[in-house]
Amino acid sequence: MVEWLDVFTRTEYKNILIESLEFCQKNKGLEIFAWCIMTNHVHLIFRSIEGQKPELLLGDFKRFTSNAIIQAIRQNYRESRKEWLLEQFEKAGSKSSNVNKFQFWRHDNKPIELWSNKVIDEKINYIHNNPVEEGLVFHPEDYMYSSARDYSGEKGLLDVFVIK
């Protein structure tokens, strides 16, 4: 998220991410191992199972969600920060030569390869504890917008391949 803006405080914007991840799972070969939507960023551990490079899959996801969320912000009559948010996205876009008007996602968040089981476990624990560290919940599995529920034996919002 550019400038670490707190966009995902509204359920409708988080739902756009959830629906987009579901679409990528069903149609683009996205296999999710862990995820978490925070107010100003998203964590995702995934792989591409249909031969598409992870960075291209992530790029498609980011392009679609940036357009969909900006459109949702524009149309949301309850969005008290509408003009300010759009101004921030436009300002960020003006700094980048490959952005037409608005920049929603940061350009420096690229997929990285997780090279060992130890590192994977560390990253999953970090992701799941993010809402606890932010004071949003007391236990990771209590946070709805995360795969921590799946790892605690409950069913979360998305299909997740739990790593044991």
What residues fall within each predicted segment?
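Short catalytic/metal-binding and nucleic-acid-binding patches
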Residues: 1-164
